[in-house]
Regions:
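Cyclophilin-like peptidyl-prolyl cis-trans isomerases
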Residues: 2-223
């Protein structure tokens, strides 16, 4: 009898140990799973919104009071840009190139969905036209590369901006730490953001060049 009782007690203890072990394993699995999920979220780099719904509208802020507007007639539709009046070097350079007809017949040579569309290079290569002088970097205290703004492109070196520009398709201010201190915003799209979005969605090759040219037929100063 004693032997039977001992076996029963032993089996009960074994079952308790088994359930205890299962419980511990379950807790460990849950904790590890939670840690992995939180870790992935914490390590994810913030990315621009892929579905922005609005673009900067014409405002009465000082930087756009009585400002110049430029019409880009492209092969995919018209885009109207309003230039900041507190960016005399950058906006002035863009306006001067428009008046000279520099942008007429150029293409958007670099297009990246959910990022930007880039154009303004008379050579169409992205290397730029060496005959066009570079300008000094110019930044305002509220330089933000948000959706719909137009900014000066450069080679990555100081004071290397020339004729190339890009239009932000999404909010790129947080794309990386120095984005807003690298690319000066000198205007914004006030009409035709749908055209910008359509250009941003065209098929491109491995170098982000559209498979079919998207051309700036003409760029003109609006009265």
């Amino acid at each position: 009898m004693a032997s039977n009782k001992n076996r029963k007690v032993s089996r009960k203890k074994s079952r308790k140990k088994l359930w205890l072990a299962i419980g511990v394993i379950a807790i460990v699995v849950i904790v590890i799973g939670a840690y992995q999920v939180l870790g992935q979220s914490a390590n994810q780099t913030p990315s621009p919104s892929a579905t922005p719904t609005s673009s900067p509208s014409s405002s009465t802020d000082n930087e756009y009071t009585n400002s110049t507007k430029v019409l880009l007639q492209t092969s995919m539709g018209n885009i109207t840009i309003e230039l900041r009046n507190d960016m005399p070097i950058t906006a002035g350079n863009f306006k001067s190139l428009v008046q000279k007809g520099t942008y007429n017949g150029t293409i958007f040579h670099r297009v990246i969905a959910n990022f930007m569309i880039q154009g303004g290079d008379p050579t169409g290569t992205g290397y730029g036209d060496p005959s066009i002088p570079t300008i000094k970097d110019e930044f305002t205290s509220d330089n933000h590369n948000v959706r719909g703004t137009i900014a000066m492109a450069n080679t990555g070196q100081p004071n290397s901006g020339s004729s190339q520009f890009f239009i932000n398709v999404v909010d790129n201010s947080n794309r990386y730490a120095s984005f807003d201190t690298s690319y000066p915003v000198f205007g914004k799209v006030v009409s035709g953001m749908d055209v910008v979005d359509n250009i941003a969605s065209v098929a491109t090759d491995a170098n982000d060049r559209p498979l079919q040219n998207v051309t700036i037929i003409s760029a003109t100063i609006l009265p």
